[in-house]
Design a protein with these regions (language model features):
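Basic, amphipathic alpha-helical hairpins
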Residues: 2-19, 38, 42, 59-67, ...
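Nucleic acid-binding interface residues in structured DNA/RNA-binding domains
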Residues: 94
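Terminal helix-turn-helix DNA-binding modules in bacterial transcription factors
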Residues: 21, 40-78, 100-112
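Append "Primarily bacterial transcriptional regulators
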Residues: 21-30, 34, 38, 71-78, ...
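Catalytic cores of transferase enzymes with a strong primary signal for eukaryotic protein kinases
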Residues: 8-10, 32-34, 46, 50-53
Length: 112
C-alpha cells in the first residue's frame, strides 16, 4: 500500500468519521483489496486502525480540556456512549479517568 494513501487517511482519521468503504473509494480500490493491503502492511483491519487513530486524537483533545461529548462528536462518533465504550476498550479506562490520571502524572512530574 502506498505510504501516501496511509498518510492521507491519517489526516482524515482525526477529523471525522470515515470507514473502510470511504477510504477504498478515496484510494480507488475495492474494499476487499484495501482490507488485504491494510492487513499485510499494518497487521489489522482498516476499521481497527481507524478506531485506534480516532482514540489517539481523542486523548489529545481531552487533555487540551475539551469535554467528552464535544470530543466524541468532533471525531465523528454518532453517540457519546459508543465513543466511551471504544475509548475504554482501547485504553482500559474511561475518558474521564484517563484525563484525571494524565493530569496527576503531569503535576507529579512538574513537582519533582
Amino acid at each position: 500500500m502506498a505510504r501516501a494513501l496511509l498518510e492521507r487517511w491519517e489526516q482524515l482519521a482525526g477529523t471525522a468519521s470515515y470507514d473502510a468503504k470511504e477510504l477504498a473509494k478515496l484510494c480507488d480500490l475495492s474494499v476487499r483489496q484495501l482490507e488485504r493491503d491494510f492487513r499485510r502492511a499494518l497487521g489489522r483491519s482498516p476499521q481497527n486502525w481507524l478506531n485506534e487513530e480516532r482514540i489517539k486524537a481523542a486523548q489529545e483533545l481531552l487533555l487540551s480540556g475539551q469535554p467528552v461529548k464535544v470530543v466524541a462528536f468532533e471525531l465523528g462518533f454518532k453517540q457519546v456512549s459508543h465513543f466511551c465504550r471504544q475509548f475504554k476498550f482501547l485504553n482500559n479506562t474511561t475518558a474521564s479517568k484517563f484525563v484525571l490520571i494524565q493530569t496527576q502524572e503531569i503535576r507529579n512530574v512538574a513537582h519533582r
